[in-house]
């Protein structure tokens, strides 16, 4: 199994959450791959810049050296995101655009999204785990 960490999970890892760090360690010991979306990178980076947090930014940059960032450089991801967005809107259960892009990336890359955000459960075909509940 390979994973795509959502923004809330990366944030908890940066805050040294023991459950998240333990699960990351277990996954690494099983040689499972862990990725970060460029959307997550953007969300966390903008947050640290907005509050002028150089130490946290440095910790985040180190974290990003450990786990590859997946970029939105594939039109198929954007097409899948558009389909997910339309489907959720038609069902009357929209979610944030950032979450749609993360979900589309995970579906096309065959990754499990790790998140503490229950909104992602609305996305059909998305594999989702909440490492805070395991």
Predicted regions and their residues:
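Acidic, PIN/NYN-like endoribonuclease modules and their adjacent C-terminal/linker elements
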Residues: 1, 103, 107-134
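Generic structural signal for small/hydrophobic residues in well-ordered secondary structure
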Residues: 6-7, 44, 81, 106, ...
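Nucleotide phosphate-binding site architecture
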Residues: 10-11, 21, 42-45, 121, ...
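Active-site neighborhoods of divalent-metal-dependent phosphate/nucleic-acid chemistry enzymes
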Residues: 70-114
């Amino acid at each position: 199994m390979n994973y795509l960490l959502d923004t809330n999970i990366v944030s908890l890892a940066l805050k040294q959450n023991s459950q998240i760090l333990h699960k990351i360690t277990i996954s690494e010991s099983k040689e499972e791959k862990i990725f970060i979306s460029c959307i997550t990178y953007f969300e966390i980076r903008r947050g640290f810049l907005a509050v002028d947090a150089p130490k946290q930014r440095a910790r985040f940059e180190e974290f990003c050296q450990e786990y590859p960032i997946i970029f939105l450089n594939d039109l198929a991801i954007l097409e899948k995101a558009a389909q997910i967005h339309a489907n959720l809107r038609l069902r009357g259960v929209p979610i944030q655009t950032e979450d749609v892009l993360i979900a589309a990336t995970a579906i096309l890359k065959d990754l499990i999204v790790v998140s503490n955000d229950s909104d992602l459960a609305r996305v059909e075909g998305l594999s989702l785990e909440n490492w805070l509940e395991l």
